[in-house]
Amino acid sequence: MGSLISEILTWLTNMGYAGIAIGLMIEIIPSEIVLAYGGYMVSEGTIGFIGAIIAGVIGGTIAQIFIYWIGRYGGRPFLDKYGKYLLIKKHHIDMSENWFQKYGAGVVFSARFIPVVRHAISIPAGIARMPFLKFVVLTVLAIIPWSILFVYLGIQLGSQWDDVENIAGTYTTPIMILAVVVIALYFVIKKRTAIFKR
């Protein structure tokens, strides 16, 4: 774990629940690490499990709402020009746009569990002017299990919480596979529904 990340996490620790939310909002540190550290704080009795989950969901959702609004009001030209300053890469935007166009709004939920497009998927949702409430609901529903998983892992790892990156694949790979299956099923159902309506 880099010294800079450790310093930031130490600073966030002093803020308790707000620190977890802020850590996820600014996205300087991967959400998995912030949530795992939150789990470590739970294991130390500094904060409560439910509170850590709520803070994670609030912080993660606000971060995605911010990206959604950028997509909605800034559009692709703004992101092509300034996306690098927001740590959003052009090929990530391209991939998420393709997914959104192919699978529709449901991908906002399932893509949250897939690396690369997990954060970028909010951009095409904003550009397409997806209903805001629908976007928030799907985002929250996806962030809840993600937060629970990594806070739990942080609790189990205790003082070795920073090993979460090494073991996360054991848990996230099945989730990613399931997410891809969900996307495929959603697409098939949507296509068949369209055929029956003809």
Curated annotation (Swiss-Prot):
Pfam families: VTT_dom. The chain crosses the membrane at residues 15-35, 47-67, 107-127, 135-155, 169-189. It comes from the Bacteria. Induction: Expression is regulated by the ECF sigma factor SigM. It is found in: Cell membrane. GO terms for cellular component: plasma membrane. GO terms for biological process: cell wall organization. This is Undecaprenyl phosphate transporter A. The lineage of its organism: Bacteria, Bacillati, Bacillota, Bacilli, Bacillales. Keywords: Cell membrane, Cell wall biogenesis/degradation, Membrane, Transmembrane, Transmembrane helix, Transport. Belongs to the DedA family. The gene is uptA. Coiled coil: none annotated. Flippase that catalyzes the transport of undecaprenyl phosphate (UndP) across the cytoplasmic membrane, from the external side to the cytoplasmic side. Is involved in UndP recycling during peptidoglycan synthesis. It is a multi-pass membrane protein. Disruption phenotype: Deletion of the gene increases sensitivity to the amphomycin derivative MX2401, which binds UndP in the outer leaflet of the cytoplasmic membrane and prevents its recycling. Deletion of the gene sensitizes B.subtilis to reduced levels of UndP synthesis. The double mutant uptA-ykoX exhibits increased sensitivity to the amphomycin derivative MX2401, but has no discernible growth or morphological defects.
